[in-house]
Amino acid sequence: MILRETLIELSEAKLIDSEILMNESKHDSSLYLVGYSIEMALKSKICKIFNFEKGFPEIKNEFTNYKNNLGCAIEKLNDIKNHDLNKLLIYSGQENTVKKELLDEWKIILEWNPEWEYILNIGDKRKNQKIFNSAKKLITLILK
């Protein structure tokens, strides 16, 4: 299990690391991390909305225990243990808020792809700044 508090700390730390890398013109690494900062924030909200008191489930048995005890609406662990930001947004309970208040920023962050880990020259300073600024606003909204 990953504690909800740990997910929040990781989200904030990855955002800080992304900014440091961006300021050092390490745009590929910065862009890669910024998406994970959003992912961690959304997963922390999933813990809250589904009352995952022991944390975010990492393995099938942990998830099955939650499902059996809470009767939650999530059918399988892969529904929430993934990098699909749209799917995570839905399960986080934040979809309406995010799309109402920060739709443009959400559309920008959806450019992110975990496969960026394997790609060179995915972005420049302008793209990095745009995605980073969007992520920062989104994380502030999601975690409030």
PLM ranges: what are they?
Residues M1-K144:
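Terminal alpha-helical segments
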